[in-house]
């Protein structure tokens, strides 16, 4: 499945907008995720964590991966910038807003807008964007309590797309609280038990090594539940 091109020089630098096809990545890292796509397409949810120290290019790699998945594999990709977030409710708000603003599948977007019509407002003058209204705790709490059902319903609207790939960029703040560890572990367990082979979805979390170790140890994940992809060297 590795049919994309890797170039000799990375054009990524702060403030430099480039074509994703020019990205120089670590081919083995990208392949370590892509090789699981057949499982995801069959409805088996997968969870990955990309670890590396600050400045290692984790965000750039996730951007490139998003491009590859959308362009070559008919996957919907959603990326959440999660820096500084330390609670699950804020994470869910950012996920819903990212879905509303970035999903290119009209039927899925319409379904989301219908479901959340009482909780959504538009902001901006040039290019309107959707956001969740400040007083929406009841909605966010209900999604947090039954996140597997939310994901299952999301996947039911894929139509001609093969899967959804959600990138949560930076879980370092969330790793500070046991509530996230417990919530995500419960989500992983229940998604598989309740909706086995019904949810073609994958998650990629990015983290510093020490924070991932804390989450893995506290959550007692097994090797089949979360796949760790170690990014030890920066891009050059």
Where does each model-flagged region fall?
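A short, basic N-terminal segment
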Residues: 1-48, 68-71, 211
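The catalytic "switch" region of P-loop NTPases
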Residues: 1-2, 15-18, 160-167, 171-236
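Short, solvent-exposed loop/helix junctions and linker helices
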Residues: 23-27, 85, 234
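Short, well-ordered amphipathic alpha-helices
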Residues: 32-37, 65-66, 151-152, 184-191
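P-loop NTPase nucleotide-binding core
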Residues: 44-180, 201
